[in-house]
């Protein structure tokens, strides 16, 4: 059985993420979408909320499961018996950063990274940009799954109420 891990912060999951996850799921027997935990960053959503949104958003992909990890990705991949990391690339800036990470991961563990070019429809999308636009009242409804969009608007309203 071939498997891959598809890591990210997914804060929140976007349609761009789902495009890459779906395409990876078509190539591998199993894809583990892994919410990477960075203790130095406070996300808009908790890790548990991100997992829940990912599980809901990938429910139609039977060979996809969702998890989280707080250490080196290659350690997780080895623990799971996974030999490939799948990353989406939006453009040259992503490539420059991701190539260095891929080379380090390969050196540390022998785990290879496979790059999937992002569908041009989503090449501008990032969770950070979506959050920023939504915070200022921009319409991001076509950039996220419907339930994720609703949760994003609710969370932004909660944060605004807390700060006023």
Curated annotation (Swiss-Prot):
Main location per the UniProt record: cytoplasm
Gene Ontology terms: biological process: coenzyme A biosynthetic process
E.C. numbers: 2.7.7.3
CDD domains, sorted: PPAT
Keywords: ATP-binding, Coenzyme A biosynthesis, Cytoplasm, Magnesium, Nucleotide-binding, Nucleotidyltransferase, Transferase
Matching Pfam families: CTP_transf_like
Residue positions binding ATP: 9-10, 17, 88-90, 98, 122-128
Site annotation Transition state stabilizer: residues: 17
Keyword Cytoplasm among record annotations: yes
GO molecular function: ATP binding; pantetheine-phosphate adenylyltransferase activity
Reactions it catalyzes: (R)-4'-phosphopantetheine + ATP + H(+) = 3'-dephospho-CoA + diphosphate
Chain residues that bind substrate: 9, 41, 73, 87
Signal peptide: none
Task of the protein: Reversibly transfers an adenylyl group from ATP to 4'-phosphopantetheine, yielding dephospho-CoA (dPCoA) and pyrophosphate.
Subunit structure: Homohexamer.
Protein name stated in the entry: Phosphopantetheine adenylyltransferase
